[in-house]
Amino acid sequence: MSNGIVIIGSGFAARQLVKNIRKQDATIPLTLIAADSMDEYNKPDLSHVISQGQRADDLTRQTAGEFAEQFNLRLFPHTWVTDIDAEARVVKSQNNQWQYDKLVLATGASAFVPPVPGRELMLTLNSQQEYRACETQLRDARRVLIVGGGLIGSELAMDFCRAGKAVTLIDNAASILASLMPPEVSSRLQHRLTEMGVHLLLKSQLQGLEKTDSGILATLDRQRSIEVDAVIAATGLRPETALARRAGLTINRGVCVDSYLQTRNADIYALGDCAEINGQVLPFLQPIQLSAMVLAKNLLGNNTPLKLPAMLVKIKTPELPLHLAGETQRRDLRWQICTESQGMVARGVDGADQLRAFVVSEDRMKEAFGLLKTLPM
């Protein structure tokens, strides 16, 4: 009898893979193992839970039991995988083990918490489970410090501000979204956040946190400090690679895979936030969806390479939403920016006047798909 496919993880990547496999094969044994409850929720919703007044349990879309019944799965929630014996093709936990024919690592990524004194006082919002652990503190907090001005930090800053909280956002960079676009493009959102009342501390560094009788004292550089009720780390994600490393797989920033989502071991694959595909870590929904479609085919005997088109990234800041695509972080692009009351269109062109990237906002976002078609593959 076939041992089938074992998937470690239960997030968006794992679920997309299950759905794509079941479209093609209704009977191959599928086993999912994960440390969480395995209930389904929409992770991007975490950026808006405070202004929406949602509790962690409100985010659940489908329970683990319903998922198992719908897709004919064996599920092992609240289970920590401790080891992979790649030679014997066995996955082990403290109390169990599973034989596999093919293994998929969909272990995701964890929130990076800056290594400063008092780092244990920082909260993270990278999962329903993490939100459940701190939802009361966040709901009751009047003053919130967000560490990190990237995509998630900017979304959270706007959300907490919309919920009526006093928000401070701190980042080492000179502008928000610095890893995604140049300051002349992000300045529109930066100005809107300031208008809403977000206190931006750019070119600034958090040096430590300390619990006080009235909150948390955050010590900053240049002999500054502020007191808040909650501190959230939004300083990026780190792919979960420890299990893959113990299995002897190649690790760089993530678990290294080729265009077929295959690791150096022919029977082990990686998908989603933990995977580094030909040198790229792509922690966004669309590349994960496309990767899951390709991997499902390959696990069932095909040999299909992943080919990713130019894709949109959406920044969900409702007061001033943005869509971007292409090589927006390239330093050599010349930006042509058209700004009006209805929104902004920023085109990044190279030395040959070829469009390489764009950012659109508000009502001008309807132009995104037309611009997307003109980007080189």
Swiss-Prot record:
InterPro entries recorded = FAD-bd_OxRdtase (IPR050260), FAD/NAD-bd_sf (IPR036188), FAD/NAD-binding_dom (IPR023753), NO_rdtase_NorW (IPR023961), Rbx-bd (IPR041364)
User: Could you name the domain of life of the organism this protein comes from?
Assistant: Bacteria
Pathway assigned to this chain's UniProt record = Nitrogen metabolism; nitric oxide reduction
Its annotated compartments are: Cytoplasm
Q: Which organism does this sequence originate in?
A: Escherichia coli (strain SE11)
EC number of the protein: 1.18.1.-
Q: Which GO terms describe its cellular component?
A: cytoplasm
Cofactor(s) needed: FAD
Role description: One of at least two accessory proteins for anaerobic nitric oxide (NO) reductase. Reduces the rubredoxin moiety of NO reductase.
Q: Which GO terms describe its molecular function?
A: oxidoreductase activity, acting on iron-sulfur proteins as donors, NAD or NADP as acceptor
- Please give the positions of the paired cysteines in each disulfide bond: none
Q: Which PANTHER family match?
A: NITRITE REDUCTASE [NAD(P)H], PYRIDINE NUCLEOTIDE-DISULFIDE OXIDOREDUCTASE DOMAIN-CONTAINING
Task: From the UniProt record, report the name of the gene that encodes this protein.
Answer: norW
Species classification: Bacteria, Pseudomonadati, Pseudomonadota, Gammaproteobacteria, Enterobacterales
Sorted keywords for this record are: Cytoplasm, FAD, Flavoprotein, NAD, Oxidoreductase
Which NCBIfam families would you find in this protein's record?
A: PRK04965.1
In which family does this protein belong, per the annotation?
Belongs to the FAD-dependent oxidoreductase family.
Catalysed reaction(s) here are: 2 reduced [nitric oxide reductase rubredoxin domain] + NAD(+) + H(+) = 2 oxidized [nitric oxide reductase rubredoxin domain] + NADH
Q: Could you tell me which Pfam families the record lists for this protein? A: Pyr_redox_2, Rbx_binding
Mind telling me what this protein is named? Nitric oxide reductase FlRd-NAD(+) reductase
